[in-house]
Amino acid sequence: MSADPTIRRELRPGDLGAIIAHHGRVYGEEYGVDATFEGHVASTVARAANRGFPSPGEAICLVELEGEHVGSLALTDEGNGEAAIRWFVLSAEVRGHGLGRRLLGEVLARAAEVGYTRVWLETFSELEAAAHLYRDYGFEVVSADAAPRWGLERITYQRYELELSKTPASLSA
């Protein structure tokens, strides 16, 4: 990595579109998903945007490298004391330096500070490095569904959950 990435914690016009496009590029190139995956991401982004994301208690982290969007991570309020980790993706050039771990730790600390009792996320099992990171923070797989989707013959969609009341006070795993 030639320069250090910067992290921006506020949305500007165009950022939500960049999150959607970045997911399509990264997961298309690395896992072979088709444009329907972008549609899936777009639907979650649209739901959040239409209700005013980010509201107090939510968070956005936008990662930029030399002015280019190279990653994102969000914490969204899902009601009933629950929050979701959404849109967590980093381009290859910024992986492997602890950035993902740091960002996840920050948003989980924020979730605990705000008073969420549970945090969940949805992903697919083929993202092995991400799964390792989630388990390090205490997330557990609560459901998995292997089926054709996003142009692939078979992909295992998973839901992870973390009960914040069972989490150590320090979320800096």
Regions of interest found by a model, annotated:
Residues 1-2:
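Short acidic N-proximal helix/loop "leader" segments that mark the beginning
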Residues 5-93, 101-106, 110, 114, ...:
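Acetyl-CoA-dependent GNAT
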Residues 39, 120-123, 128-131, 135-159:
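Conserved catalytic-core motifs of GNAT/GCN5-like acyltransferases
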Residues 97:
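Flexible nucleotide-binding loop
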Residues 111-123:
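Conserved GNAT acetyl-CoA-binding A-motif
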Residues 168-173:
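C-terminal end segment of the histidine kinase catalytic
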